[in-house]
């Protein structure tokens, strides 16, 4: 619960409060009102709800329906004149985050917070950290793939980083469940939309950076994307940074005055020797490690998670056990066909992650390699060109373009755009299950492989803004083994 006096105090302290307006009268203060619920969904309203009118797509009728349901107060950037008092602020997103923190009694102060950012690898690194910390602690986790608030029960996530009202509610639930740590993926969008405004992490990890999420409804430029990624470093007490990442020199200079560790290329903490499902590390994590996820980039993710968890109370033994136990739904999942051919299912959904995935597959499989790939609609349009550029460096790979969350775009048009950037003939099979069935029928020997990229463990297709039924790549592939 929270009183209106407490709400106004939070907003004024952040210099975000403008005024309360009610029937054309202005108020600097208000008393005698208590809220027991926060919401940004006009369908989730009680008379004692404090409602936040947010988003570019917010419509007056949403607020009118909330008033009909008994709403008495709302927070907004303008007065919608619906007959109830409006708490006006300059930035609704900042207001949501800080009011949520106060409403849930600052649950972040009762947890050790670990956050990962990067163009790729956030989910894998989060799973490594979860398995490491659960050896001796009680971690909760918010990831793109799954969320757990009790360390045992997992449910699907809707956003990489939840909206602030949901985020702090989840934190409070984790605290009530006795959790000691929280592992989060923090996207650039989370900072762009201020979902984590006012939040300081104990450890922040920057895994890598490459062009992605650049488009009309995301980041206008790479510079903007890079800047919002780096905000995690500014808002973390200690940081872990990949010395092999693009623009590392800039980032290293930026964090020079912070408590930090570097890992990877030319750093103290690096993989000394690697052989498929094991590696030897030097530096703070020196020792021999077993790992289920093949590929140098997965070993780097393990190193990043290990260094972060070392700062949060994990022992080297915890780190070794956690890394060995980690598998990730939709990340480098491998099936074997009756003829011995391999099927790799992976979430690789941008040019850089696709390149890393294909490097691993071509290193291990020396026969005919096929790839099924698509691109989502209405987001990350730059990926389509990036995919083409990557595939031009693998001329031997047989490419089938298919549907991958087309949203409000025509999947055929998306596939044709990707194909326009590939300098050889490719096939387009719009039905993703048919594409998988066709490709699997063409892998004939134990050295052959099919790579199904983009959706990972997602058991849905996004069409016209809604999730529609789709069994998922791994389940479809199992049908045709």
Swiss-Prot record:
Record's GO cellular component terms:
cytoplasm
The reply on keyword Cell division is: yes
Where in the cell does this protein reside? Answer: Cytoplasm
As one GO molecular function, the record gives: ATP binding
Q: Which Gene3D superfamilies match?
A: Mur ligase, C-terminal domain, Mur-like, catalytic domain, MurE/MurF, N-terminal domain
Q: Where does this protein act, in terms of pathway?
A: Cell wall biogenesis; peptidoglycan biosynthesis
Per UniProt, the short sequence motif L-lysine recognition motif occupies residue numbers 404-407
Q: Where does UDP-N-acetyl-alpha-D-muramoyl-L-alanyl-D-glutamate bind?
A: 42, 158, 160-161, 187, 195
What are its GO biological-process terms? cell division; cell wall organization; peptidoglycan biosynthetic process; regulation of cell shape
The EC code for this enzyme is 6.3.2.7
| Signal peptide (UniProt feature, chain positions) | none
Q: Which UniProt keywords apply?
A: ATP-binding, Cell cycle, Cell division, Cell shape, Cell wall biogenesis/degradation, Cytoplasm, Ligase, Nucleotide-binding, Peptidoglycan synthesis
Positions that bind ATP: 118-124
The main location class comes to cytoplasm
Q: Which residues carry this modification: N6-carboxylysine?
A: 229
Catalysed reactions, as listed in the record: UDP-N-acetyl-alpha-D-muramoyl-L-alanyl-D-glutamate + L-lysine + ATP = UDP-N-acetyl-alpha-D-muramoyl-L-alanyl-gamma-D-glutamyl-L-lysine + ADP + phosphate + H(+)
NCBIfam families the record matches: murE, PRK14022.1
Q: What does this protein do?
A: Catalyzes the addition of L-lysine to the nucleotide precursor UDP-N-acetylmuramoyl-L-alanyl-D-glutamate (UMAG) in the biosynthesis of bacterial cell-wall peptidoglycan.
Q: Which family does it belong to?
A: Belongs to the MurCDEF family. MurE subfamily.
| Protein name, UniProt field | UDP-N-acetylmuramoyl-L-alanyl-D-glutamate--L-lysine ligase
What is the species listed in this Swiss-Prot or TrEMBL entry? Answer: Streptococcus thermophilus (strain ATCC BAA-491 / LMD-9)
Write the gene name. Answer: murE
């Amino acid at each position: 619960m929270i009183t209106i006096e407490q709400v106004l105090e939070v907003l004024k302290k952040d210099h975000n409060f403008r005024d309360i307006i009610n029937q054309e009268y202005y108020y600097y203060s208000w008393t005698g009102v208590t809220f027991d619920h926060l919401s940004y969904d006009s369908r989730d309203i009680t008379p004692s709800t404090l409602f936040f009118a947010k988003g570019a797509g917010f419509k007056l009728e949403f607020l009118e329906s909330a008033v009909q349901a008994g709403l008495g107060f709302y927070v907004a950037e303008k007065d919608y004149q619906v007959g109830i008092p409006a708490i006006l602020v300059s930035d609704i997103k900042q207001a949501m985050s800080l009011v949520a923190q106060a409403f849930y009694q600052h649950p972040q102060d009762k947890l050790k917070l670990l956050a990962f950012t990067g163009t790729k690898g956030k989910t894998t690194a989060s799973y490594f950290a979860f398995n490491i910390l659960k050896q001796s602690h009680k971690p909760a986790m918010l990831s793109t793939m799954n969320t757990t608030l009790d360390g045992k029960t997992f449910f699907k996530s809707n956003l990489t980083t939840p909206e602030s009202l949901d985020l702090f509610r989840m934190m409070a639930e984790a605290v009530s469940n006795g959790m000691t740590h929280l592992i989060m993926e923090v996207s650039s969008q989370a900072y762009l939309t201020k979902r984590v405004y006012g939040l300081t992490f104990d450890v922040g990890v920057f895994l890598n950076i490459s062009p992605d999420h650049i488009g009309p409804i995301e980041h206008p430029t790479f510079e903007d994307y890079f800047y919002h990624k780096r905000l995690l470093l500014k808002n973390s007490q200690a940081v872990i940074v990949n010395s092999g990442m693009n623009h590392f020199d800039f980032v290293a200079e930026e964090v020079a005055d912070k408590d930090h560790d570097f890992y990877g290329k030319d750093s103290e903490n690096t993989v000394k020797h690697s052989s498929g499902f094991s590696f030897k590390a030097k530096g703070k994590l020196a020792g021999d490690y077993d790992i289920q996820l093949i590929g140098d980039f997965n070993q780097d993710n393990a190193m990043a998670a290990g260094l972060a968890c070392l700062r949060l109370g994990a022992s080297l033994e915890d780190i070794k056990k956690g890394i060995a136990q980690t598998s990730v739904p939709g990340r480098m999942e491998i099936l074997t066909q009756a003829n011995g051919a391999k099927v790799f299912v992976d979430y690789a959904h941008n040019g850089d992650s696709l390149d890393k995935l294909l490097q691993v597959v071509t290193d291990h499989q020396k026969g005919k390699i096929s790839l099924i790939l698509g691109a989502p609609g209405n987001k990350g349009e730059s990926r389509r060109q990036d995919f083409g550029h990557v595939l031009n460096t693998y001329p031997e790979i047989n490419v089938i373009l298919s549907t991958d969350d087309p949203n409000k775009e025509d999947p055929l048009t998306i596939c044709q755009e990707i194909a326009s950037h590939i300098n050889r003939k490719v096939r387009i099979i719009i039905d993703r299950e048919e594409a998988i069935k066709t490709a699997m029928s063409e892998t004939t020997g134990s050295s052959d492989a099919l790579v199904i990229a983009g959706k990972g463990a997602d058991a849905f297709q996004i069409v016209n803004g809604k999730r529609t039924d789709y069994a998922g790549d791994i389940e479809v592939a199992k049908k045709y083994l």
